[in-house]
Amino acid sequence: MSTIEERVKKIIIEQLGVKEDDVKSAASFVDDLGADSLDTVELVMALEEEFDTEIPDEEAEKITTVQAAIDYILSHQE
C-alpha cells in the first residue's frame, strides 16, 4: 500500500503531466508546476476521488503546494 504522500504525488504527476523529480514538497502548483486554475480544480477533484473525501472550496483555495495537499489529506483521513 502506498503512503498518502506517494498517492498525492502520483495524482499530481498524472493531473499536471509533470516529472516526478519536479514534484517537491514546497512546489507550488501554479508557480513551479505550471498549473492553471482549471488544472487546480481538476487536481482537487482527483484528490477527492482518490481519498474518498470532499474538499470545500474555501479549503481547496488554500491547497496551493504539494505539501499543502498532503497535509490536508493527512488531517482529514478517518
UniProtKB/Swiss-Prot annotation:
Top-level lineage group: Bacteria
Compartments where located: Cytoplasm
Maturation and modification: 4'-phosphopantetheine is transferred from CoA to a specific serine of apo-ACP by AcpS. This modification is essential for activity because fatty acids are bound in thioester linkage to the sulfhydryl of the prosthetic group.
GO biological process: lipid A biosynthetic process
Keywords annotated in UniProt: Cytoplasm, Fatty acid biosynthesis, Fatty acid metabolism, Lipid biosynthesis, Lipid metabolism, Phosphopantetheine, Phosphoprotein
Carrier domain ranges (all copies): 2-77
Listed pathway(s): Lipid metabolism; fatty acid biosynthesis
Stored Pfam families: PP-binding
One cellular-component annotation, GO: cytosol
GO molecular function: acyl binding; acyl carrier activity
O-(pantetheine 4'-phosphoryl)serine modified-residue sites: S37
Family, as annotated: Belongs to the acyl carrier protein (ACP) family.
NCBIfam families (UniProt xref): acyl_carrier, PRK00982.1-2, PRK00982.1-3, PRK00982.1-4, PRK00982.1-5
Function: Carrier of the growing fatty acid chain in fatty acid biosynthesis.
Protein name: Acyl carrier protein
Natural source organism: Tolumonas auensis (strain DSM 9187 / NBRC 110442 / TA 4)
Lineage summary: Bacteria, Pseudomonadati, Pseudomonadota, Gammaproteobacteria, Aeromonadales
